[in-house]
Amino acid sequence: MTVFLSFAFLAAILTHIGCSNQRRSPENSGRRYNRIQHGQCAYTFILPEHDGNCRESTTDQYNTNALQRDAPHVEPDFSSQKLQHLEHVMENYTQWLQKLENYIVENMKSEMAQIQQNAVQNHTATMLEIGTSLLSQTAEQTRKLTDVETQVLNQTSRLEIQLLENSLSTYKLEKQLLQQTNEILKIHEKNSLLEHKILEMEGKHKEELDTLKEEKENLQGLVTRQTYIIQELEKQLNRATTNNSVLQKQQLELMDTVHNLVNLCTKEGVLLKGGKREEEKPFRDCADVYQAGFNKSGIYTIYINNMPEPKKVFCNMDVNGGGWTVIQHREDGSLDFQRGWKEYKMGFGNPSGEYWLGNEFIFAITSQRQYMLRIELMDWEGNRAYSQYDRFHIGNEKQNYRLYLKGHTGTAGKQSSLILHGADFSTKDADNDNCMCKCALMLTGGWWFDACGPSNLNGMFYTAGQNHGKLNGIKWHYFKGPSYSLRSTTMMIRPLDF
């Protein structure tokens, strides 16, 4: 307030004593009014004024920026009086200002108190609002901080658990690493020992190789000499075999001549020594040939009941006691077994090689007496096996040469690859199987297929290396599987009472 009044007083003095070369109006002589606006309050000051007019300085000895004077201009020799007058005027102004200040203070007390009270009330209301807002914001922030704290605690707990798990895993890994390190060290030690042993073995092996090289050279010389000897022996054997074949042929021709002579003598009624007529009994099968004293495997002539002509067959006198009549043989694929019904009926091929005896002859032979069947098998690795049946016979042509078997044994599988309950014979031109697919056309050859079945010894012949994965080959399922084509097969029969 004091500063404000000081500014007001300064403004009044400047207004009062300024020299502007303007004349005052008559109504304003002796007094001067000054109005000051401060906020909502307006203050009017009445300032006394000295009689006389301000003179304008005409001399250059005074400052050009000098203020207008209240007293009339006098000459310089009256300067002391002027100063006294000014001092007196200043004292009056000072007293007047003190009175004015006291008046303003007295009159402004109530207004200032009211203003302060209003300001305090407004400030209090504002502070209350601000406080309320701060409290609500503080509560909201506190709630958020609580949530954040909860989340932080939960996250911290999870992190602690995870850290603990990681610590356990790290401990386990360290333990495993330590164990593996120990094992690696042990293995390294073993490797060192093995390397040492290997070096020793290499030295010994080198010595042995040198020895073997010497022995190999000696053996090669020996093999060369033995090869020459073997070749000479083979030549001798071939010559002996040729001679033997000639002798066998001569023997067969001689036997045929003897049989013809016997038959001729029987028909002409020739009497033998002692005057008795003896009827010659022909060979019904190879068992009769064997029992007659012929125990060498080869081709013999037999006389089958109800057949108009004799039949040449191959007799196996070596396997399981001999006396076997061969009815089928495969060995080199030189004969085509994809034949028709009539050919399988009467037979085809050469008894000394690959051949089929003929269904009509097999039926006639097995109708004479009870027979057993033996099947010899060999694969391309040289393994041999057999299947044997205690009872074997087939029906006539009207019965489609139906197969009848009983009592299976042997090494070519625990189960029989032939149909035991009976199956009709089928060829490419006579489909008698139990399948819509015509097994004889699909699997080739003539056989007792039933529903194509697990065997076909008259199938296509495949050479070594091409015998795998062949469903239409020479197969015996329970020996080598359904798609392995065998190297050789032999089917032969012998009387049960042999």
From Swiss-Prot:
Protein name as it appears in the record: Angiopoietin-1
Signal peptide per UniProt: 1-15
Cited Pfam families: ANG-1 (PF25443), Fibrinogen_C (PF00147)
A molecular-function term among this protein's GO annotations: receptor ligand activity
Cell compartments where the protein resides: Secreted
Cystines in this chain: 286-315, 439-452
Coiled-coil residues: 81-119, 153-261
